[in-house]
Regions:
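Short phosphate-binding/catalytic loops that engage adenosine nucleotides
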Residues: 186
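Short helix-initiation/N-cap motifs at beta->coil->alpha
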Residues: 167, 190-200
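Detector for C-terminal structural segments
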Residues: 29-63, 169-178, 202-306
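Extracytoplasmic
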Residues: 7-9, 50, 156, 267
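Extracellular/periplasmic solute-recognition and catalytic clefts
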Residues: 1-18, 41
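Append "and occasionally in soluble cytosolic enzymes with long acidic Gly/Pro-rich linkers
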Residues: 22-178
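A structural preference for short, hydrophobic beta-strand core positions in alpha/beta folds
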Residues: 3, 161, 190-192
Length: 306
C-alpha cells in the first residue's frame, strides 16, 4: 500500500544568455511545440498532474481558469515566422505579442466555454491587429514570412538540452521535447549528465534548455522558484515584491493571479506539473499514514504489525 506525501514540480528552464531564447516569439514557439500531455503520460506514466505554475493546483492561489500555452504546432510555426521579423529588428526587439493564437483550451473545458473564450480572444486579437497595422507599413506581417525564411533563421541554431541521467522520467521527457522541437525545425542535442555535471552545467549556464525540478514548499509560495528562473524583468520583480509585501489574503490572491498571467504571456518557463512521491508500506503492516506537506511520517505511531 502507498500514501502520497511529497509534492515535487518539474519544468524547463531557459538560458536567457542565449540571444534566441531572449526573444519572446522563440520562447512561445517552443512552448506551443512541446506536448506536455504526452510528457505526463509517456515520461511520468501519469504519475503527475499537469500544472502551469509552480504551485499545487489545489492551492487557493493557483489560477485554474488561466488558459495555458498548450500543444499546438500551428501556433508554434506562426511564432517562428514572427521571430523572423522580431529578431531582424535589432533596435526594436520588444516583447510585443500580436500573433493570432488558435484555441488551445484544456480538454476539460466545455464546448460552450470554448466558444465564449474564443469570442473574447478574437475581439482582443482584432484590437491587437489594428494596433500592429501601423508597424506593418514599415515591413511585413508574420503571415507573409515563408518557410524558407524560417529555415534560414534556424539553420545555425541547435539548442542544447541538459538533463540528469539518473532521473529516468526527465530523460524520457527530454527525448519527447527534442522530438517536438525537431518537428517544427528546431535542432537539438540532449546531454545526459551525472549529478555533479548537472550542477556545474547549471552554474556555468552551459545549456540552452534544462530539465530540472524541486520540492514545493509546505506553504504555497512560488516566489523562490520564479526568482531562480533567471528572467531579468522589472515588472516581474514588481509582482514578486508585491507578494512579499502583501497585507491581506485577498491581496495575495490578486497578485498571484496577475503574476501567473504575466508568466504565461512572457513564456518565462515551461511547467510539466506536480509529481507525487509516496511512502510505501509493507502488506504485513496495519494502519494508515495521514502524512501531509509538513510531516511525511505523520501517523506512523499508529502503524502496527499484523
Amino acid at each position: 500500500m502507498w500514501t502520497p506525501c511529497i509534492r515535487k514540480t518539474s519544468y524547463v528552464l531557459f538560458n536567457y544568455d542565449n540571444e534566441y531564447l531572449k526573444n519572446l516569439d522563440i520562447r512561445k514557439a517552443i512552448s506551443f511545440a512541446i506536448d506536455r500531455n504526452s510528457i505526463i503520460k509517456d515520461a511520468y506514466s501519469n504519475r503527475a498532474k499537469l500544472t502551469n505554475f509552480p504551485l499545487n493546483s489545489t492551492s487557493v492561489y493557483y489560477d485554474n481558469e488561466l488558459k495555458p500555452l498548450s500543444y499546438n504546432t500551428e501556433n508554434a510555426n506562426n511564432y517562428l515566422k514572427k521571430a523572423v521579423l522580431s529578431l531582424s529588428k535589432t533596435d526594436d526587439n520588444k516583447e510585443k505579442d500580436t500573433t493570432d493564437d488558435k484555441d488551445n483550451t484544456d480538454e476539460e473545458k466545455t464546448e460552450a466555454d470554448d466558444k465564449a473564450t474564443n469570442n473574447k480572444e478574437n475581439t482582443s486579437d482584432k484590437k491587437d491587429d489594428k494596433k500592429d497595422s501601423k508597424d506593418s507599413k514599415k515591413g511585413r506581417y508574420f503571415k507573409d514570412i515563408t518557410n524558407s525564411e524560417v529555415r534560414a533563421l534556424l539553420k545555425d541554431v541547435t539548442f542544447k538540452i541538459i538533463v540528469n541521467k539518473n532521473n529516468s522520467e526527465r530523460v524520457k521527457a527530454a527525448t519527447i521535447i527534442s522530438n517536438n522541437l525537431e518537428a517544427i525545425g528546431i535542432k537539438t542535442e540532449i546531454k545526459d549528465l551525472e549529478d555533479d555535471e548537472m550542477t556545474k552545467a547549471l552554474d556555468k549556464k552551459d545549456y540552452d534548455l534544462a530539465l530540472i525540478g524541486c520540492e514545493l514548499p509546505a506553504v504555497s509560495d512560488a516566489t523562490y522558484i520564479i526568482k531562480q528562473l533567471g528572467y531579468d524583468d522589472k515588472q516581474l520583480d514588481k509582482y514578486l515584491n508585491a507578494l512579499q509585501n502583501a497585507n491581506s489574503e485577498d491581496e495575495i490572491k490578486s497578485t498571484y493571479k496577475t503574476l501567473q498571467k504575466y508568466v504565461k504571456e512572457k513564456a518565462i518557463f515551461i511547467s510539466f506539473g506536480i509529481l507525487d512521491d509516496y511512502v510505501v508500506l509493507n502488506g504485513r503492516l496495519d494502519g494508515e499514514l495521514i502524512c501531509n506537506d509538513f510531516n511525511v511520517y505523520r501517523g506512523i505511531n499508529t502503524i502496527k504489525i499484523k
